[in-house]
Amino acid sequence: ACVPVYEECGTPKKRCCEERPCK
């Protein structure tokens, strides 16, 4: 299942199925 993760650190922007979640 796709998990929404943050596209950019500290931003409300989210993307689905990000290869590498922001750490």
Swiss-Prot record:
Any one cellular-component term (Gene Ontology): extracellular region
Keyword Disulfide bond attributed: yes
Cysteine disulfide partners in this protein: C2-C17, C9-C22
Cell location: Secreted
Broad class of the protein's primary localization: secreted
A Pfam family of this chain: Toxin_9
Domain remarks: The presence of a 'disulfide through disulfide knot' structurally defines this protein as a knottin.
Chain's role: Antagonist of L-type calcium channels (Cav1/CACNA1).
Protein known as: U3-ctenitoxin-Co1a
Species for this entry: Ctenus ornatus (Brazilian spider)
